[in-house]
Amino acid sequence: IRDSVQGVGFRPHVYRLAVRHGLKGFVRNTESGVEIHVEGKPGAPERFFAALMDTLPEHARVYGVEQTVCEPAGFEEFRIVESDSTPGGVPMMLPDLAPCPECLKEMRDPASRRYHYPFTNCTHCGPRYSIIEEMPYDRAGTSMKKFQMCPECLREYRDVEDRRFHAQPIGCPSCGPSMKVLFSDGSELGFGHGFDTPAEQVAWVLA
């Protein structure tokens, strides 16, 4: 499947659908899009593909599909596997996506561990184009490779029911990028000045 299918939660969506249809095989990113290999009972792959095309993630755009019938390889489960970086076309890179309602809710919730965290994101939103260094789109090919996930972020990343399942830019105040405002002399403007958010700090400096 080619074009805008990386960085939109496509692989997690494929994984859930494949498991729901009782299929075995894998899904992985490639240089030109996403490769899916499915094996199952007669009719199951066709039903899976129809469901996939009917329920694409919000920001996914499919412009080309190539289907091949092959002999079963005997996979025992369905997995998201390591990307294939073999040259094979030019994929479409997504622009950065505005925070989704769920992420905004977390950022505004004092009980959330991402309260006021400006880099909150998930598979439905957050940075894409601005952090990509190479394709396929994997954390190791983005500027986020410098930030090792904390145990809690890693748990979300591995949880198939979590909206951050395989979200490549995932992070939090404990393990992700941070932001600070510096004066021209190098001194830092801290929250002690009566500001609750980085945005309020910046607005005060620019006023």
Residue ranges and their predicted role:
Residues 1-180, 189-196, 203-204:
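Intrinsically disordered, low-complexity, mixed-charge
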Residues 185:
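Gly/serine-rich nucleotide phosphate-binding loop at the start of the catalytic core
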